[in-house]
From Swiss-Prot:
This is Large ribosomal subunit protein uL23c. The keyword Ribonucleoprotein applies. It is found in: Plastid, Chloroplast. It comes from the Eukaryota. The keyword Chloroplast applies. GO terms for molecular function: rRNA binding; structural constituent of ribosome. It comes from Stigeoclonium helveticum. Belongs to the universal ribosomal protein uL23 family. SUPFAM superfamilies: Ribosomal proteins S24e, L23 and L15e (SSF54189). Pfam families: Ribosomal_L23. Part of the 50S ribosomal subunit. Keywords: Chloroplast, Plastid, Ribonucleoprotein, Ribosomal protein, RNA-binding, rRNA-binding. Binds to 23S rRNA. The gene is rpl23.
Amino acid sequence: MIDLIKYPVINFKSYRALVLNNQYMFNVDLRLTKPQIKKLIEQYFEVNVISVNTHRPPRKKRLYIQTSPGYKKRYKRVIITLQKDQEIPYIKSLMASNLAAAMQRVQNAQTSPNSNEA
């Protein structure tokens, strides 16, 4: 059952949606419908889902190798809105730690002197 939820989307846009609107983003199997996704999230994470929005991002080409040309697998992206007083603690802490690491990398890149300039 959990195989249908592939992984949470962790980037700046999803973190902003989490903080401002209490929305979580997941990539899920293409075959799932909105009612199935809602039931799956409510059962697995024990939260109350207010709304489910879905979309299918465009396919991306694979690195061209003559023996295996084609596209990457398709997936469905889901935006789940929870009630204001509820959260998924594991995903929230995962996003916060990744955001902190990314901000640290940006600060290090800005403060380190550029070795190419001489």
